[in-house]
Amino acid sequence: MTAFVLLHGFAQTPASWDAVVQQLQAAGHRTYVLDLYESKCDLKLLSTEGALEDAEQGKGVEGDAGAEGALASARDPLASLGAVCDRVAAIVRLVAQADGAPVLVGYSMGGRIAAETVVRHSDLPLAGLVLESAGLGPADEAARVALAERNGAWAQRLREEGVAAFMDWWETLPLFATQRDLSSEVRVAIRAEREAHSAELLARSLEAWGAHHQAAEAATLSAVSDLARQGVPVLYVAGVLDEKYAAVAARAHAVGVPVVLVPNVGHNVHLESPSAFGGIAEGVLAEGGFVEGALA
């Protein structure tokens, strides 16, 4: 049994991981799904099956004053990218106390936060790191400035137009083109999830957690590569139809980060092909590791 800590993407909720959670639990693993937008955090509520009950009684989780103190101090995750990363790191350490080092999995914005957490907390106890369609930071200062301007414009649009109008536009972006082929039931659920958040909350997350605050891509790749050299399985996952993040995957692969490109899917691999993604995440733990490359 291994624990998995899962971080959702922009305008998502923990429910976005439901299909993957079911697959991992069926294989005997424990799952902790963090609501990145929640201002308060009770670790017991993160467990999708109450996995911490035994830990509180006998494994000393409550006695980990350092991790608990860090979690308490990071209760306003929207203060900054550093604040949400500190919170993720504290949760990872508490889960490690309860269940052993977990696999940290992040999608898109959640993947950026996972990667930045590794940059800022090099001593994090991890059994694996899976980054799905995640930006790894600006290439240079010009890119950082452009990202800051873009995220600021998006935040302003949210505040001026509201969530519904913003999402009408958001869903037309080429990044989400493949999601238009999903069933109407799934698309309705995605839209409801996106509209569950307030415009101000989403705007603040763009301003506080945007890619313009990340370490440069070279620094992120260095930290992720260092993790792999320490024997921690690391994997970057992208959909073949997502040209932007398939290119990020290629740059990661060029410096030795293992990559899996999943065919016939776009940006959100775990939504468009949950069984494939669940198998990839679980495969990080397999003896000999996952099979790198494009899946047939």
PLM regions and their residue ranges:
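Catalytic histidine-centered segment of alpha/beta-hydrolase-like enzymes
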Residues: 265-274
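Short beta-strand element of the alpha/beta-hydrolase
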Residues: 3-8
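Conserved serine/cysteine hydrolase catalytic core
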Residues: 195-251
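Short beta-strand immediately N-terminal to the catalytic nucleophile in serine-hydrolase-like folds
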Residues: 104-106, 132
